[in-house]
Amino acid sequence: MSPVNPATNPDGTRPGRIWVILILGAAIVALAIGIIGISTQEPGEEFKDVVGAQDTRQIFGGVRQLDDRLGNEDAPVQIQVFADVQSSTYQEQFLDTIPPVVTRQVRDGDVQLLLRNRSLTRNATEISFYGVQAAAEQGYGWQFAYLMVRNQEEAEKRRLNEEFLETLAGAIEKMDQIQWKEDFEEGIEPGSAMEEDLIDQDKLAIQLEIRDAPAFVVTGPNGTEVLQDGPDLDALQLAIDEVR
């Protein structure tokens, strides 16, 4: 009988080899679990980091949208909302005014909102505006605008590009992401119809002498009120009552 080598077990295997086999086995199991997880992933799971996705359903769910309009087109009061959804300076102003008006007066059919993308920079358009417009073509423009506003901190940490906007689009329930991407990519092409529409929105702001801050143009049976410089909810509500 040959003597047992101290570097081997009685069965002839090396201890180190056993550990290698165990580690490889564990890695294979982990890989298999990962593949199964990806294949069974529910739609939207990869977008868990998007802030406000659940809120969009509560605020905007069931409210009619058509292009830039949110609410009933026969609503007696119309509010043109001039906003730069990329501007972190006026994040709170947007969140303090739009959701309350939507959940109360827009949902009840008393008010309709029209979204006007208004850049607070030297450029007439911004990349997020194209994301809003692409979503609006499916009737989800307001959800996209809301998510852009809610996720401005994340946009500042990461690069605000098509990939980031695609993440926001993926968090909007029932919106066709493939169609959104096609519309977005077509829209950002120079000279596109979407670009012309955004330029027209900027021209309208200039025509109405909207200053470099969020504004509301409130129109109703009793006239029009123009609210400048990031008006709060109280000022907006007062204007609604004035023109109603």
Which residue stretches match the model-derived regions?
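Alpha-helical scaffolding within the catalytic cores
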Residues: 64-65, 98-100, 203
